[in-house]
């Protein structure tokens, strides 16, 4: 089964401003909360699914570091984030990305002016999608389809794939800090 993602956030309506933001999601969430937090859920070496391996330009049998976190604003879960970092990318400038703990990956990526972000891709995930299943294992209250986006960040030949699932609670966030 092919995992088709869209080049535009067609049909996303209320989620579109969140999905299409090309800047740091961490910074944007901080503007909408008094207390922003990263809740680490899972960190492990794994073989990536075929679609993700293709985006990262690695063989599906090559191990990647998989990191899953929940981004929280004032205690409320608003985004489930899933990132994959090929083993060979964890050297040099990005060697610390595997040890972020409760620190934001976005802050680390956007701190380097040499970093290039690839095109954003969008998808309304059904409960059958593997990313949805990853998220619902940690957020059992999730119901119905969830909008997500993904993109590849590159620094030279190194790449990291970041997928973000926007929970309905993100739509209720007030603007607190400009």
Curated annotation (Swiss-Prot):
Keyword terms, alphabetized: Cytoplasm, Lyase, Pyruvate, Ubiquinone biosynthesis
Biological process annotations from GO: pyruvate biosynthetic process; ubiquinone biosynthetic process
Pathway in which the depicted protein is active: Cofactor biosynthesis; ubiquinone biosynthesis
Catalysed reactions listed for this entry: chorismate = 4-hydroxybenzoate + pyruvate
Domain of life: Bacteria
SUPFAM superfamilies for this protein: Chorismate lyase-like
Function: Removes the pyruvyl group from chorismate, with concomitant aromatization of the ring, to provide 4-hydroxybenzoate (4HB) for the ubiquinone pathway.
Alphabetical list of PANTHER family matching this protein: CHORISMATE PYRUVATE-LYASE (PTHR38683:SF1)
Name of the protein in its database record: Probable chorismate pyruvate-lyase
